[in-house]
Design a protein with these regions (language model features):
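N-terminal loops that bind phosphate or other acidic moieties
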Residues: 1-71, 81-82, 86-187
Length: 187
């Protein structure tokens, strides 16, 4: 493996968007890693040129899409990274953004999770493990909705349909936001 710079990674995201636009693709997927990319690829059966390995750089992707739009964007990622995105982070790397567990506890408490347990958790994975499937789905869906709102705010455009998919470590859908009636995406 050959390491490369953050700026080179972001440039590769930009080139991916350029290729998608040059091929008139109506839908691209920005993923934080292989597990979320594999889930989204199976779900939508899109060509490889529609897959953007954004990694931690959701901000770099969204900023470029402001001036280089694609009609439909799916952002797929792990729970922890999308919690950070829902809280306004645009660089999702652990060294550059952290989860506000107190804020997450405020969302989780009405779902039946103990406020102090969530607020004092060491990781989002710990919260996933302490929640039952219904709580996990509800919390992931709330996080997805807030991440979608954060993406829309950062993107500064209303003409791109945005969907958020929260994917578990084992590749299952935990929650989502952005689907409207009859499976169409809300703008």
């Amino acid at each position: 493996m050959r390491p490369f710079s953050c700026s080179a990674w972001i440039a590769s995201i930009h080139r991916g968007i350029d290729v998608a636009r040059a091929n008139a693709l109506p839908h691209v997927i920005g993923s934080t890693g292989a597990t979320s990319e594999n889930f989204a690829k199976k779900r939508y059966d899109l060509p490889d040129i529609a897959l953007l390995d954004m990694g931690d750089f959701v901000g770099g992707m969204l900023k470029y899409m402001r001036k280089n739009p694609v009609p439909r964007l799916t952002i797929a990622g792990g729970f922890g990274k999308l919690v950070k995105m829902s809280q306004g982070a645009v660089d999702l790397h652990s060294a550059r953004s952290q989860v506000d567990f107190e804020r997450l506890a405020t969302l989780a408490t009405p779902l039946g999770l103990r406020h102090d347990a969530v607020a004092n958790a060491n990781s989002v994975l710990e919260i996933v493990q302490m929640s039952d499937p219904d709580q996990r789905h509800a919390l992931a869906s709330i996080v997805a909705g807030q991440a979608r709102d954060a993406a829309r705010t950062y993107l500064k455009r209303d003409d791109i349909a945005i969907e958020i998919l929260v994917i578990s470590r084992d590749g299952a859908l935990l929650g989502q936001a952005g689907l409207g009636q009859a499976g169409s995406l809300e703008l």
